Every structure is written in structure tokens, then in C-alpha cells.
Swiss-Prot record:
Name of the protein in its database record: Copper-containing nitrite reductase
Binding site for Cu cation 2: H136, H171, H342
GO biological process: denitrification pathway; nitrate assimilation
Organism encoding this protein: Alcaligenes faecalis
Up-regulation conditions: Under anaerobic growth conditions and by nitrite.
Record remark on domains: The type I copper site in NIR plays a crucial role for electron transfer from pseudoazurin to the type II copper site of NIR, which comprises the catalytic center of NIR for the reduction of nitrite.
Family named by the database record: Belongs to the multicopper oxidase family.
Gene field: nirK
Main location: periplasm
Gene Ontology CC annotation, any one: periplasmic space
Residue ranges annotated for the Plastocyanin-like domain, each copy included: 34-211, 212-376
Length: 376
């Protein structure tokens, strides 16, 4: 195990040197490409108001204003990286997760367009691997990955301007080991709201009563010669076997929020008839097809970009791997709604399913049982 970990460590650190060398090159190239775009000075950024936000565990999202109040500001977040064992199904299957803030997925961060997101990222000395973060919402230095490589016992602070409105993936991207870290749960999402809030593309404001974040995760768990899932003492011990499974491109589990059933039963998401709910859904690695059984997507940004007018009245929407999407729905009927990846094999056999538990009065005009199931 020690030798395996040393090999992994050397690979990571060798790649880190290359990525570190790339960062100033990328920064220089970015400066040439700015053209007439005005850059704020360090003094101007330092004078901006600051807001410190405490992140919450998914599927919940920290408190935020849907319409920006005042001008741009610096929004401060802190995330601590955890390497830990998690159980991903009822059979007790274990994975050595790599988790932003200890959750799979990592927390959803919300800012407004033209705000500055400032992240303090901490890699405790109790961890064994180098980590970093690549924000798909950011510009330059590999999404920040080239500036945030931290070994155990280190921290870094990254600030970037949120220039494009939408929902975006973030993930760990250590040189030479990006896929392994991503499929070990090290990904999450950020939402950059338009300063005026969401709109339907025709001038109508869209205001949600609740927001939930669903992070879809594919796991690749090795099996032993008897077909049983293997368990390992440390992340490095699992590396070679896990990569072999990864290369088949066939996940053993596809789950929402870290485990089979994580958002079902007494952990189901909740709403009431008439409530407007925004669902943010990310998949950092594979394509997915969200579908709300018994409902619809009234307004859907399938690729997650709010400058694009939303599609309306959708039954199923397609989110490409490495992206996040958003769907806005007003619940019309009470009961249990299943929210699934409509690759039904992945939903029913591998775990990509969640529930909404909705309260309120039934509307017979929308649906009624004319004849209950009975003998002919």
C-alpha cells in the first residue's frame, strides 16, 4: 500500500509542476485576448463589499437573493476536502470518496453575474492526496485548477469573476488523475444568477419558492473473483483496480447525491401544490436524461445557461456529461413524484432515482380514476 501511494504521489506532484508552469502562460494569453474589455483594478476589487456564505449540504442550498441587491460584490466561500469511506447502497458497498466539504456532490454555490467568487480551499493534513478545483464557470488557468493544487496540510484562496450566468460544474482535476478523482465523488456545481433574476426569455420573471441540487454520480467499484464488491483500507489501494473498471466505461452504480436512495423515503425532497421549484442537476462525467414522473419541466435550461431562453413544457431533458442543467416546475398535484435519469436501467437497476413528496389537495380536473382496477 505504501509503495502504491508513493507512486501515486510522485505522479501527482510531477504533473503539478507542469500545471504550475502553465498558469502564467495562460494568464498572459488571457491578457492579450481581453481586447477592449475593461479590467477592474486590484484597488477597485478590494473596495467591493464582501459577503461570507456558509455552505449547506445538498440537496439543500444556502440562502441567497434571486435578484441582486446593489452592485457586484465579493462572495466568500470555504470548502474543506475530505477523503473518507462512504456506503453507496443497501448492500454496504463502500467507496473511498473524495469529497468537497464532505459531501457527494459538493455544495451548490450561488452568486450573481459580475460578482467575484472567492473560495478558500483546505486540504487537511489527514488526507493522503493532492487536490485542486476546476470551475467550469471561470476563465483562465484550467478553470482555476492550475492555481489551486494543494497537498495535504495546505490551503489556497482563489478568486474569479462570474461573467456568464448559468449553472456550471466544478470538479477536482489533479494532473494525471482527473477521472479517478471525479468518479470518486469530487465534483459539485455553482449557480450564477442573472443580476435581475431568472426570466422566461420573453420578459416574464421566474421566481422559485424552493431550490434543490441533485448531483448525479457514477461509481466504478471493483469486484473480487466471486463477484462481490471489494473493500480497501486506503484510496491508493483501490486505484489500479478502480481504473480497470473505469476503462470499461460501465459504472457499477449511478446514483443521486452519493448513494442509492439518498433522496427517497424520509429523505425525499418536499414541496406543496402551487410551489415553484427549481431543480439544479449536474453530471460531471456522463450524459443524463432527467425526467419527473408525474410532472414536467415548465421551463428548462438543459445545458444550464441562463442567457439562452428556456425550453418549455419538457417531458425529459438532456444534460451532457461535464455540465449542469436547471428545470423550473410548479407542482400541480399532491403525492410522490419520482425524479429519475430516464435511462431506466440506470434509474431502476443502478440507483439514479429520487423522490419529491408533495402535499396539497388533489385536482380531479387534471386526473381522476374513472374506473378503479377491477375484474372484467
Amino acid at each position: 500500500m505504501a509503495e502504491q501511494m508513493q507512486i501515486s504521489r510522485r505522479t501527482i506532484l510531477a504533473g503539478a509542476a507542469l500545471a504550475g508552469a502553465l498558469a502564467p502562460v495562460l494568464a498572459t494569453t488571457s491578457a492579450w485576448g481581453q481586447g477592449a474589455v475593461r479590467k477592474a483594478t486590484a484597488a477597485e476589487i478590494a473596495a467591493l463589499p464582501r459577503q461570507k456564505v456558509e455552505l449547506v449540504d445538498p440537496p439543500f442550498v444556502h440562502a441567497h437573493s434571486q435578484v441582486a441587491e446593489g452592485g457586484p460584490k465579493v462572495v466568500e466561500f470555504t470548502m474543506v476536502i475530505e477523503e473518507k469511506k462512504i456506503v453507496i447502497d443497501d448492500a454496504g458497498t463502500e467507496v473511498h470518496a473524495m469529497a468537497f466539504n464532505g459531501t457527494v456532490p459538493g455544495p451548490l454555490m450561488v452568486v450573481h453575474q459580475d460578482d467575484y467568487l472567492e473560495l478558500t480551499l483546505i486540504n487537511p493534513e489527514t488526507n493522503t492526496l493532492m487536490h485542486n478545483i476546476d470551475f467550469h464557470a471561470a476563465t483562465g488557468a484550467l478553470g482555476g485548477g492550475g492555481l489551486t493544487e494543494i497537498n495535504p496540510g495546505e490551503k489556497t484562496i482563489l478568486r474569479f469573476k462570474a461573467t456568464k450566468p448559468g449553472v456550471f460544474v466544478y470538479h477536482c482535476a489533479p494532473p494525471g488523475m482527473v477521472p479517478w478523482h471525479v468518479v470518486s465523488g469530487m465534483n459539485g456545481a455553482i449557480m450564477v444568477l442573472p443580476r435581475e433574476g431568472l426570466h422566461d426569455g420573453k420578459g416574464k420573471a421566474l421566481t422559485y419558492d424552493k431550490i434543490y441540487y441533485v448531483g448525479e454520480q457514477d461509481f466504478y467499484v471493483p469486484r473480487d473473483e466471486n463477484g462481490k464488491y471489494k473493500k480497501y483500507e486506503a484510496p491508493g489501494d483501490a486505484y489500479e483496480d478502480t481504473v480497470k473498471v473505469m476503462r470499461t466505461l460501465t459504472p457499477t452504480h449511478v446514483v443521486f447525491n452519493g448513494a442509492v436512495g439518498a433522496l427517497t423515503g424520509d429523505k425525499a425532497m418536499t414541496a406543496a401544490v402551487g410551489e415553484k421549484v427549481l431543480i439544479v442537476h449536474s453530471q460531471a462525467n456522463r450524459d443524463t436524461r432527467p425526467h419527473l414522473i408525474g410532472g414536467h419541466g415548465d421551463y428548462v435550461w438543459a445545458t444550464g445557461k441562463f442567457n439562452t431562453p428556456p425550453d418549455v413544457d419538457q417531458e425529459t431533458w438532456f444534460i451532457p456529461g461535464g455540465a449542469a442543467g436547471a428545470a423550473f416546475y410548479t407542482f400541480q398535484q399532491p403525492g410522490i413524484y419520482a425524479y429519475v435519469n430516464h435511462n431506466l436501467i440506470e434509474a431502476f437497476e443502478l440507483g439514479a432515482a429520487a423522490h419529491f413528496k408533495v402535499t396539497g389537495e388533489w385536482n380531479d380536473d387534471l386526473m381522476t380514476s374513472v374506473l378503479a382496477p377491477s375484474g372484467t
